[in-house]
């Protein structure tokens, strides 16, 4: 009964936010909003292609902490801890300045209209598309929070050593199912990880990691030191959005433990990974659907929250 009540609550929250959000939300109030954001994001990624992964991750880290409300953008104050300082974000999350630049560009044409939360969501879509990923309609109309939630960030952002059960339960609490989990994890076809996050995988086990892959990665990630050294999550096509991530998992070449647990355990995720490795169109379609679904998590709409003037501070 308790689980049923939780599912009903999640469904009601999701459906209410969906009723408030729409791809055409700004058509009458700021017709150039989405094109202005797109131009700003494309400029940023053209300067640093890795930024695409950072922007997708930023949207994920925003939505998983008390909903898609741009709380991740807020800097600390004497009375508020910042999510930027949480375990999963500190010296790791990136793209804040890109969102700030996009916000400034939008403010110059439509002051006080477009939320930072919407800019983050649109930026993630535009980033995906720019590096070869799918283009999907982003529903907009979110409003920004007036608080940050560091404790929730420490609790609800996935750990790089998370088990499949931990990940599945976390995603379920956010209203996302197993297919959503596997599809969204495919964003790790892009980006890089610090040595600290995969050192344990290289040196503490040998059962679920390809020996050659492990040997190669150890060269730049020694057992002692080098914790901040970066390595691509997908060694083959690190800057292109494709389905190679899933082929890597099938070959025991997932860089993070939380990636490799999706394949090889006999769980239901095995068949989804196999499907995506063989059918890039299905992966692209499911990734788009999961991103839209994630963007509906616990949004602020109507008169809730505010439209921040700058994304790093409440009005």
Swiss-Prot record:
Signal peptide: 1-19
Chain residues that bind Ca(2+) 1: 62, 65, 67, 69, 71
Protein residues bound to Ca(2+) 2: 189, 234, 237, 242
Any Gene Ontology biological process: response to oxidative stress
Cofactor(s) required, per the database record: heme b; Ca(2+)
Gene3D superfamilies: 1.10.520.10, Peroxidase, domain 2
Cofactor comment text: Binds 1 heme b (iron(II)-protoporphyrin IX) group per subunit. Binds 2 calcium ions per subunit.
Location of the active site: 61 (proton acceptor)
Binding annotation for substrate: 158
Binding site for heme b: 188
Disulphide-bonded residues: 30-110, 63-68, 116-311, 195-221
GO molecular function, one term: heme binding
Subcellular location(s) per record: Secreted
Modified residues annotated as Pyrrolidone carboxylic acid in this record: 20
Site (Transition state stabilizer) residue list: 57
Enzyme class: oxidoreductase
Catalytically driven reaction(s): 2 a phenolic donor + H2O2 = 2 a phenolic radical donor + 2 H2O
Any single Gene Ontology cellular-component annotation: extracellular region
Location, primary (coarse class): secreted
PROSITE patterns assigned: PEROXIDASE_1, PEROXIDASE_2, PEROXIDASE_4
InterPro entries found in the cross-reference section: Haem_peroxidase, Haem_peroxidase_sf, Peroxidase_pln, Peroxidases_AS, Peroxidases_heam-ligand_BS, Secretory_peroxidase
Note: There are 73 peroxidase genes in A.thaliana.
Stated family: Belongs to the peroxidase family. Classical plant (class III) peroxidase subfamily.
Protein name: Peroxidase 4
